Amino acid sequence: MEQSLHLEIISPDHTIVSDRVTYVNLPGVNGELGILPGHIPLMAALDIGKLHYQQDSKNYYVFISAGFAEVSNNKVTVLTEAAEKASEIDVARAQAAKERAKARLLKAEEDIDMARAEAAMHRAIIRLNISSL
């Protein structure tokens, strides 16, 4: 059995990762999905969260917005609206987004879209958590 699989993380404007890896953990909408070489074919909806993969015994982390994953023939393809490697997350920008979302949530006006503010807060917190890994 092959000891690695090919991981591609693709957003509309560029490919974030395209490499051989030994393990991938995806943030599925129904929970985390662990993918090893030889995994059966799979299509999965992804939630906003942390994608984790291993390469040469090193751990790597990527923030992804919601998207889809396809697993087939030792290849994992992730299609997402946005993705950032942990090392590329702008912590100041993520912190500012968190503060803006917090301010909107504290402002109890009817014209505030609470679901959007909560989603923005959730994204910012995940990005900040991933940036420290």
From Swiss-Prot:
The Swiss-Prot or TrEMBL record annotates one GO molecular function as:
ATP binding
What InterPro entries is this protein classified in? ATP_F1_dsu/esu_C_sf, ATP_synth_F1_dsu/esu, ATP_synth_F1_dsu/esu_N, ATP_synth_F1_esu_C, ATPsynth_dsu/esu_N
Cite the entry's keywords alphabetically.
ATP synthesis, Cell membrane, CF(1), Hydrogen ion transport, Ion transport, Membrane, Transport
Q: Where is this protein found?
A: Cell membrane
Q: Which Gene3D superfamilies match?
A: ATP synthase delta/epsilon subunit, C-terminal domain, F0F1 ATP synthase delta/epsilon subunit, N-terminal
Give the highest taxon in the source lineage. Answer: Bacteria
Which residue spans adopt a coiled-coil conformation according to this UniProt entry?
none
Q: Give the CC-aspect GO terms.
A: plasma membrane; proton-transporting ATP synthase complex
What is the membrane topology listed in the Swiss-Prot or TrEMBL record?
Answer: Peripheral membrane protein
Q: Which NCBIfam families match?
A: ATP_synt_epsi (TIGR01216), PRK13446.1 (NF009980)
Return the similarity comment: Belongs to the ATPase epsilon chain family.
HAMAP family on file:
ATP_synth_epsil_bac
State the function annotated in the UniProt record.
Produces ATP from ADP in the presence of a proton gradient across the membrane.
**Quaternary organization:** F-type ATPases have 2 components, CF(1) - the catalytic core - and CF(0) - the membrane proton channel. CF(1) has five subunits: alpha(3), beta(3), gamma(1), delta(1), epsilon(1). CF(0) has three main subunits: a, b and c.
Q: What is this protein called?
A: ATP synthase epsilon chain
Origin organism is Lawsonia intracellularis (strain PHE/MN1-00)
